[in-house]
Amino acid sequence: GLMVILRPSVYICAEWEFGGLPAWLLNEPMRLRSTDPRFMAKVRNYFQVLLPKLVPLQITHGGPVIMMQVENEYGSYGMEKAYLRQTKELMEEYGIDVPLFTSDGAWEEVLDAGTLIEDDVFVTGNFGSRSKENAAVMKEFMAKHGKNWPIMCMEYWDGWFNRWGEPIIKRDGQDLANEVKEMLAVGSLN
């Protein structure tokens, strides 16, 4: 069957409006993607409905879900490791027991800020070109923390953002094919 890497966490980005967060959160005075108790109460409310539905779908319970994401590209947004830890702990509290991961750009500053490598949460990267260079940065980051984990590109970007009123961004097909070939040679494309 199909194995699933699930990204159910609070902020998913995925180029969705407001990163998938509900817009009504802006009506309440709170700091988003932080340990602000008002925000974390909303996270708890979300998780207490969603996560019990996902527990039986984990591979540890006979389902297809092999991994779940704690946060997406947090290192490009904030540096509050306590927020990442609280999110991880809530996931575990509600029964998530498959390997957890974070996903960030492949440069040291955002990996430092957006990962929980020190808590053994798997590190993945997001990129769509310069695969050898990005994989080397990730490998060096992991080695610095005593990890010999596989390199994994969680989001392989085959295009880029289009904005209203601007020309459509197109990527050359041969360029994309060459980049994918390079990533496959590195050995880790999700």
Give the predicted meaning of each segment:
Residues 63, 118, 186-187:
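Structured loop/turn residues at beta-strand edges in well-structured enzyme cores
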Residues 4-8, 66-70, 100-102, 123-125, ...:
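Hydrophobic faces of well-ordered beta-strands that scaffold small-molecule active sites
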Residues 9-13, 70-75, 103-107, 126-130, ...:
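Active-site beta-loop-alpha junctions enriched in small/polar residues
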Residues 2, 90-94, 130-190:
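Catalytic-core region of carbohydrate-active enzymes that cleave or remodel glycosidic bonds
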Residues 60, 115, 183-184:
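Structural motif
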Residues 1-98:
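Active-site mouth of glycoside hydrolases
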Residues 75-96, 104-142, 146, 168:
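Substrate-binding cleft/loops of secretory-pathway carbohydrate-active enzymes
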Residues 21-26, 117-121, 170-171:
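Short, hinge-like loop/turn segments at secondary-structure boundaries
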